[in-house]
Amino acid sequence: MTSSVIPPSPSAADYAAEGDRPLVPETDNPIGLFQDWMAQARASEPNDSNAMSLATVDADGRPDVRIVLLKGVDSEGFTFFTNLESVKGVQLAANPVAALCFHWKSQRRQVRVRGGVAPVSAAEADAYFASRAAQSRISAIASDQSRPLADRAIFEQRVAEISSVYGDDNDIPRPPHWGGFRLVPTEIEFWQDQAFRMHDRLRFYRKADGGWATVRLYP
């Protein structure tokens, strides 16, 4: 079945015009490789190079996925923030495992991550919340994220009321229903597009001693 809205598969001429792409480099530091790829994506993506799909599961084992923004990555893991009473917040509290997927079209690259999830400290959540624009903080306070909204005007009125409370005061505290999570990776897979679907895949998986092992995968 075909559709006019779906682009056709690349032709041999299309692949020839694009040229060769590098393979995923061998390394014992997948976090460092991810940071390198993120830096390259930031320089080439039109916006939100830190956007990622976050997959969770509900109490019945049904999957959910949505786009969120990565706000930190280091040897401890991948950090993001959210309303803790949102669907994802509730699901992560009940079943603290998740998967991430980054797709950078400009680089023809993808990174998949799986692992356990833990809340960040209150101090870390406070620090990030304070770094946000004042109006974004007010919006976070006002939002009952994922719950039914009878009329957008209700939300806008709530934002206006909270804004009037703080006025020009930039000291807007983090509400208790807002915080962050850190995904501690057990698997990280790097994918690089190659001609004729001969894509390159390198998977890192955590060893018992805390180090990383690698395996290349068929595309």
From Swiss-Prot:
EC class: oxidoreductase
Keyword Lipid biosynthesis: no
Gene Ontology MF annotations: FMN binding; pyridoxamine phosphate oxidase activity
Any one of the GO BP annotations: pyridoxine biosynthetic process
Cofactor: FMN
Family matches, as InterPro entries: Pyridox_Oxase, Pyridox_Oxase_CS, Pyridox_Oxase_N, Pyridoxamine_oxidase_dimer_C, Split_barrel_FMN-bd
Region (Disordered): 1-23
Pathway membership: Cofactor metabolism; pyridoxal 5'-phosphate salvage; pyridoxal 5'-phosphate from pyridoxamine 5'-phosphate: step 1/1; Cofactor metabolism; pyridoxal 5'-phosphate salvage; pyridoxal 5'-phosphate from pyridoxine 5'-phosphate: step 1/1
Chain positions recorded as substrate binding sites: 71, 128, 132, 136, 197-199
Family in the record: Belongs to the pyridoxamine 5'-phosphate oxidase family.
Function: Catalyzes the oxidation of either pyridoxine 5'-phosphate (PNP) or pyridoxamine 5'-phosphate (PMP) into pyridoxal 5'-phosphate (PLP).
Database matches in PANTHER family: PYRIDOXINE-5'-PHOSPHATE OXIDASE, PYRIDOXINE-5-PHOSPHATE OXIDASE
Protein name stated in the entry: Pyridoxine/pyridoxamine 5'-phosphate oxidase
